[in-house]
Amino acid sequence: MRFSKTMRFSICAALALGVAAACSGAAERPLRGPFPLLVTPWTEDAKLDVPTLVKEAEFVNRCGAGGGIGPSAAEVLGNLSMDEYRRGLDALAARAARPDFKARLTAVCPGRSSAEALTRARLVNELQKKHNVEMALLARPPDNATNEAAIVAHYRALGEVAECPVIIQTYNGKSPQQSVASIVALAKEFPHVYGWVKEESPGGLVNGRMAELVAAKPAIKTVFSGWGAKGWLYQGRRIGTEGVVTQRAPYADLLVYIWRRIENGDADHTLLDAYSKLLLMYNLGDTLGGGSDSMRGPHLYVLQKRGIFTNRLTRVHAPKGAKNGKKWEMKDVPLSDLEKAEIDSRLEAVKPYLLKGEICPRD
């Protein structure tokens, strides 16, 4: 069959549009709702427990979360080797490629330097192609970024490398705060990469910055709450954040329940009670050890109770001069019968807001 010059031009244009659509398809799929960071599971012999990590991601997906993020940022640079990072993400990507997995698999993409973070981004590109899966990145500034120019330079370099949406995390505890104007400028320069922001500035700045970012739509597509969802009720209802990025995977179904009530204007008037139950579970860390910002400690028991984790172990660096020159040691979370009874009682109170059929007290 012969085509006229006009027909050939039309076919080429259509093919070009198709390629562009394929490249930007991930960006067009909304990223919103709860994005829990997965709690990293360990084996008794100090290895990353990859099957349990996948099981945790499956739980987050069943709960209806918008995404699942792994591995935990603090553990990436502190405890997790690059090989473990790769193996964990590879297994998660393979699972996320199956049709029943709707949550957006999101890879934490930190780095001591910009180069290290870009290495992680290239790995994600590789895994997306290998498994034919759409992913996203959660990217904070590199640890050695000492001024805004360095932060912006890193994100521009990442914008050239990343082949999926990037959620900018605005705070890493080390670098200065990036301006809202520069975040918006990046979203306009790289519209298929940027425009999603986890805003968690320190102190009293966060709510005002969120309002500025929400006002910058459509360049800014989604503003997520952070800081453990502790300000999410106000930020979601009054400012307009459209989800939360937080280390709260044991309570993914509770996060989804809260999110749906924020979305529908609290049609059944249960939002305040559900949110209070989330804070009730956070308080376990303050009461039984670990603090309210960590999902280890007593929350590992919750993951056990819900049939996700098999132990309550955490891998930590062995002290200098340790016997046999071992690099790691495993720390357990001992809980008395009284402490377990307290956790069980609180889970029972939260049960009306948890996903039916999931393992919890008296299921």
Q: Where are each of the predicted segments found?
A:
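Bacterial N-terminal signal peptides that target proteins for export
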Residues: M1-C12
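Bacterial N-terminal signal peptides
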Residues: S10-A20
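Bacterial Sec-dependent signal peptides at the C-terminal "C-region" and cleavage site
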Residues: G18-E28
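Active-site beta->alpha loop and helix N-cap motifs at the rims of alpha/beta catalytic domains
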Residues: E28-P176
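C-terminal alpha-helical cap/extension of soluble enzyme domains
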Residues: P36-P41, G64, R237-I239, R248-D363
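Buried hydrophobic positions in well-ordered alpha/beta secondary-structure cores of metabolic enzymes
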Residues: A46, V60, L92, L158, ...
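Short helix-capping segments at alpha-helix termini
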Residues: R95-K102, Q128-H131, A162-C164, E189-V193, ...
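Catalytic alpha/beta core domains of metabolic enzymes, predominantly
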Residues: Y171-S292
